[in-house]
Amino acid sequence: MHTLRKHANIQREDTELKLALIGALAAVLLAPAVHAGETLDRVNSTKVLKVATNAGWPPQSFLDDSNQLVGFDIDVANEIAKRLGATAEFDTPEWGVMTGGRWGGRWDVAVGSITPTKPRSEVLDFAGIYYYTPYVFAVHKDSTLTDPKELNGKRIGVETATTSEEYVNRSLVIDAPGVPPVEYWLEPGEVKTYADSMLPFDDLRLGDGVRVDAVISGEQTVLGAINNGYPIKILSGEYAFQEPLAIVADKGDAEWTSKLGETIAAMKADGTLSQLTTKWYGKDYSE
């Protein structure tokens, strides 16, 4: 009797285990179908596009005198939303949070001039390149330096958790077709990092060599600072590197990423991106 009961218990446990394994396998197989296109469905339903961007990065995105977000990235995001039949709703998370992925539905897209790099590709999906920027070396207007190669051994300022920091640390790997490999020749004496894109320029404007000798940043950002009265200039000569910028989605929704990619391609084809880069930067950076 005990032997039969024990055998029956073993059979029941074995059956329950098999059913549990079948259920788990079914959940795994069905999960992509459940979540595929989830973001696009939500945007179509709510008519709202939740956009992550920056609040202090002129002329890409910044607060104007009326405390309203304006800039190139804001115009691009609004145009994407318009073409999707939605209205853009902006949020300005910390840079590392925005580029760290695992958004948990907080945002549908990031329009923040984000470079497609190998580490970011593990947690984000790149929908498409929408413009390019050369990274340049900015110095105080009173600096006697004339060539970027003279910056070896100098104090260099960069924004933290950006491609500028990766460049000075020689760890930058850009994950985009057609972009030449980064050449590392700069050997800074000291690297100073800052939590915001404009803070390095705030130190540089204090005087030649007062806190930093140079800042590495995108050409558009440097020109924006010059236009806003910062007493700085760009060293002529070679760029630090050429950077493609991508529209970004959270990892895992291929249908949504594809839809964004189609929208970006259409904006490039009809000249919208050319017009917007010219509007904000004075030249066409869309190609």
Which positions does each model-derived feature cover?
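Ligand-binding clefts/hinges and TM-proximal coupling segments of bilobed small-molecule sensing domains
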Residues: 37-38, 163-186, 230, 235, ...
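Periplasmic-binding protein-like
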Residues: 55, 131-139, 185-186, 219, ...
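Extracytoplasmic small-molecule ligand-binding "clamshell" domains
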Residues: 37-113, 259-260, 267-270, 279
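Short helix-initiation/N-cap motifs at beta->coil->alpha
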Residues: 90-100, 143, 183-206, 220
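Acidic, polar ligand-binding/catalytic clefts
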Residues: 78, 82, 87-150, 233, ...
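A ligand-binding cleft/hinge motif common to bilobed small-molecule-binding domains
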Residues: 96-100, 114-122, 166-175, 202-241
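Extended ligand-binding regions for polar small-molecule ligands
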Residues: 37-38, 74-83, 142-145, 149-163, ...
